[in-house]
């Protein structure tokens, strides 16, 4: 038992344990098959079901000789295309989600094997492994704690919020653990989280066989709730469907009434009357189909999928893809300093004193492995330990590690110190390490760095130390102080009358590109607040270097912030740029108050205590180097922990929303025009404005293909020159409404010209029907060029989205082929050169009208 606890498994045992007890990898959730996606495409939409019913009726009429096969065949072809696109999109999104889940669930832990600390994938844990457990880490397998003490939360498994204290088991370790052991003081369970302390555990059960294995598998299949965007889009679709249905019913009634008044049903066989009514009902149904922008769900899925891929390429893992559009609304980013604004690579710059070396070793989460490499702990822990290498003091480390530790106080960002109690020759004494102002105010003596004598810490010496610390802080050097006292530490209490041992200052340089990213944020209307655990002077120095803080801005300590009333904080919020010695509770309070003022807030975090603020923020950016708790609370994981990636993510979020809006600005004029024209047309002519087959063709072309086209629009630099999207304004701003109104007016004007002044150029119903069809196709393409840019150059950036010109050309070519070659199947007629020229000229009416709108809007 003792040997196992210290050395862990040997390499030869790992594979045999895996073969005997299985892997720790949980089974993959069952994926949808192609047949499942086909069923979804055909039977999840009531309109598609109605289309299939209509196709069967049309087929019956064709078989009985009262109709042609063109209508049911075209409906079947369109349904086939819709199904194919739905299956392709669904499978693509599913595969993207699977890969995202795989990457976001990729977690590592430290185990001891062959007597050395090794970092392994959590899936590679085997029964018998000696696993190191740390604050903020998830427990990945069932087992017993054998060293250290921890408090764990079972909330993720059973909803119980009370933390359970765990301490080492003595003697024999049972082979099995049951759920009856949740409150057992020695048992640890997969799926729970370490909220306090650290230690080691022996694994007894892995994977699906753990107590919570089935629950953990089930949690992988839970669907995310709808976001504000999807709810808004669904409401829009419902609104259009409702009014489209009303318009379809009115159009159907008008066509039947006009037919009756005109005597069309007199002396007709009942089967011919039934055929005519079915055709009119088919047109009415296709009006509903055309009115509803079915491409909306597809473009949301497509753009989300593309953004997840694009973000991953730039070190952004969108574990909650639904939050991608939320980034377009962000106007406040609250960021950590260490590792986010700075490199996180700590280099010792100042070493004041020599008496803290044993404190530095024992009061530290980092260790030297057998090869002499520093592992574990955070960047400051590792920087502290590297001092021993600089001073050639490895003997100090070896001697210190032999001493008996009887109590630990883990570092807390709230308490701002850590501690350790050591027993030597039956005497217990304690070491403390933390923020200099916290340590220094509790010290009454100090160790003379020259002679090593313990002396009174008088006002003069205290002032000298404070001056040294202040000078270091102004140079953006972060300082950590050390002290000692006889006796065992008390939990969460920093004692008085300590002996000051000295301090260390480490430098953490600004990351490359941060200054430029901060400037981009300013130009994009985004406020940046640095929230750091550093001293105020250090925080201001880094913020000034990054361009966050300027003369006239406000920088506060955590204490100053906590003493302010809510209304005062809201008043100064626009000028607030720095909060130093920041506690996690301050982060949560700032997020809450900023949201109350209407701001959309992003918060970064890496610690367990950051999780409430990350969860409360509109978008939570968790650091990849952070705890499992922080990453679980975050929406986005920054795999490089870099501030520049946040700004990049915001740019992609804005691109997402612009692409959605472009599709709506493109699609809705077509939907509205079809509704209006189908309603008005029966007053001026017999029959329908377009046949059901033609409306379905337009619908599949405009909805499905252009959702791919606009979904592929790349990010644009001008998006970061705009102000953020505003909460509560809905999907359409003033300019968007003007674009839709202008385009709808242009469509209507073109058809008025076609149907009246130019009517004599098109002979017979077949040619007129062809003209109406191809004009709509051509105008849609021209409108697409208009909505994708805000300037006069309609070809700007056209090569960056190769799908757009390809689909535009495909639509134009398809319209020509249908009109000139496939006309017989659809009741059309080929057009001559002059007729095509009229169509082309009329389709371009939208360009000067939209340019005029853009000119007026720019003023």
What does each model-found stretch correspond to?
Residues 40-63, 79-83, 106, 238-265, ...:
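Alpha-helical transmembrane segments of multi-pass membrane proteins
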Residues 106-110, 284, 295-364, 613, ...:
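Conserved catalytic phosphorylation-site environment of P-type ATPases
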Residues 187-195, 326-500, 506, 519-520, ...:
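Cytosolic catalytic regions of ATP/NTP-dependent phosphoryl-transfer enzymes
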Residues 105-234, 563-573:
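Cytosolic catalytic regions of P-type ion-transporting ATPases
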Residues 24-106, 219-314, 522, 532-536, ...:
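Hydrophobic alpha-helical segments characteristic of transmembrane helices
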Residues 8-40, 104-111, 164-165, 171-172, ...:
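Non-transmembrane, extramembrane segments of multi-pass ion/lipid transporters
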Residues 226, 251, 283, 296, ...:
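Membrane-embedded transport module
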């Amino acid at each position: 038992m003792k040997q196992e606890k210290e050395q862990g498994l040997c390499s030869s045992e790992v594979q045999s344990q895996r073969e005997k007890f299985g892997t720790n990898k949980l089974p993959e959730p069952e994926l949808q098959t192609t047949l499942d996606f086909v069923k979804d495409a055909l039977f999840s939409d009531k309109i598609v079901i109605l289309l299939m019913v209509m196709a069967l009726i049309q087929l019956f009429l064709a078989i009985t000789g009262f109709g042609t096969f063109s209508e049911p065949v075209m409906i079947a072809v369109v349904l086939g295309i819709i199904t194919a696109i739905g299956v392709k999109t669904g499978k693509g999104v599913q595969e993207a989600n699977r890969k995202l889940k795989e990457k976001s669930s990729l977690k590592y832990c430290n185990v001891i094997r062959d007597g050395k600390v090794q970092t392994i994938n959590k899936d590679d844990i085997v029964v018998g492994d000696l696993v190191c457990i740390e604050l903020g880490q998830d427990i990945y397998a069932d087992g017993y704690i054998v060293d250290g003490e921890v408090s764990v939360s079972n909330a993720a498994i059973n909803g119980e919020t009370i933390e359970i204290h765990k301490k080492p088991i003595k003697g024999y370790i049972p082979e099995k653990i049951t759920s009856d052991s949740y409150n057992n003081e020695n048992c640890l369970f997969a799926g729970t989280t370490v909220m306090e302390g650290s230690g080691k555990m022996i694994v007894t059960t892995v994977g699906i066989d753990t107590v919570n294995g089935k629950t953990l598998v089930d949690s992988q299949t839970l669907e995310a709730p709808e976001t504000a965007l999807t709810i808004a889009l669904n409401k829009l679709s419902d609104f259009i469907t409702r009014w489209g249905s009303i318009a379809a019913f009115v159009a159907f009634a008008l066509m039947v009434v006009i037919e009756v008044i005109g005597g069309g049903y007199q002396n007709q066989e009942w089967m011919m009357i039934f055929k005519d009514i079915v055709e009119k009902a088919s047109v009415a149904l296709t009006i509903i189909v055309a009115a509803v922008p079915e491409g909306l769900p597809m473009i949301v899925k497509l753009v989300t999928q593309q953004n997840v891929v694009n973000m991953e390429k730039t070190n952004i893992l969108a574990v909650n893809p639904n939050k991608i559009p939320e980034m377009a609304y962000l106007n406040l980013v609250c960021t950590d300093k260490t590792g986010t604004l700075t490199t996180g690579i700590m280099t010792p710059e100042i070493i004041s004193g020599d008496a803290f070396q044993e404190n530095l070793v024992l009061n530290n989460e980092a260790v030297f492995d057998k090869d002499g490499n520093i592992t574990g702990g955070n960047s400051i822990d590792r920087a502290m330990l590297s001092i021993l290498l600089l001073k050639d003091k490895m003997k100090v480390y070896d001697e210190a590690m032999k001493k008996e530790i009887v109590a630990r106080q883990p570092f807390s960002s709230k308490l701002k110190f850590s501690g350790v109690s050591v027993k030597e020759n039956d005497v217990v004494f304690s070491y403390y390490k933390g923020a200099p102002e916290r340590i220094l105010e509790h010290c009454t003596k100090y160790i003379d760095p020259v002679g090593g004598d313990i002396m009174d810490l008088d006002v003069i010496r205290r002032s000298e130390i404070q001056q040294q610390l202040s000078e270091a802080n102004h140079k953006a050097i972060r300082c950590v102080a050390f002290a000692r006292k006889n006796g065992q530490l008390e939990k969460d209490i920093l004692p008085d009358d300590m002996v000051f041992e000295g301090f260390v200052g480490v430098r953490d340089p600004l990351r490359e590109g941060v200054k430029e990213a901060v400037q981009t944020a300013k130009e994009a209307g985004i406020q940046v607040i640095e929230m750091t655990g550093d001293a105020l002077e250090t925080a201001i120095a880094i913020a000034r270097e990054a361009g966050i803080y300027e003369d006239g801005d406000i920088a506060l300590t955590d204490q100053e912030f906590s003493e302010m009333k809510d209304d005062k904080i809201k008043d100064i919020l626009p000028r607030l740029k720095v909060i130093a010695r920041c506690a996690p509770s301050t982060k949560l309070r700032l997020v809450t108050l900023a949201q109350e003022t209407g701001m959309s807030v992003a918060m970064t975090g890496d610690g367990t205590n950051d999780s409430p603020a990350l969860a409360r923020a509109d978008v939570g950016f968790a650091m990849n180097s952070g705890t499992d708790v922080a990453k679980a609370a975050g929406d986005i994981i920054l795999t490089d922990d870099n501030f520049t990636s946040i700004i990049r993510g915001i740019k992609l979020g804005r691109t997402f929303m612009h692409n959605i809006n472009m599709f709506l600005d493109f699609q809705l004029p077509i939907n509205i025009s079809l509704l209006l024209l189908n309603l008005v047309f029966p007053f001026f002519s017999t029959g329908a404005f377009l046949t059901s087959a033609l409306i379905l063709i337009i619908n599949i072309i405009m909805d499905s293909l252009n959702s791919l086209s606009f979904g592929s629009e790349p990010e644009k630099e001008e998006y970061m020159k705009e102000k953020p999207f505003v909460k509560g304004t809905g999907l359409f701003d003033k300019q968007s409404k003007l674009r839709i109104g202008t385009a709808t007016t242009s469509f209507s004007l073109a058809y008025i010209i076609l149907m009246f002044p130019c009517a004599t150029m098109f002979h017979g119903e077949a040619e007129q029907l062809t003209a109406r069809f191809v004009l709509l196709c051509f105008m849609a393409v021209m409108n697409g060029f208009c909505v994708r840019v805000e300037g006069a150059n309609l070809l700007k950036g056209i090569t960056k989205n190769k799908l757009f010109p390809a689909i535009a050309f495909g639509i134009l070519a398809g319209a020509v082929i249908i009109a000139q070659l496939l006309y017989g199947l659809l009741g059309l007629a080929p057009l001559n050169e002059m007729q095509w020229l009229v169509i082309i000229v009329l389709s371009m009416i939208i360009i000067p009208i939209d340019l005029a709108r853009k000119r007026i809007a720019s003023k």
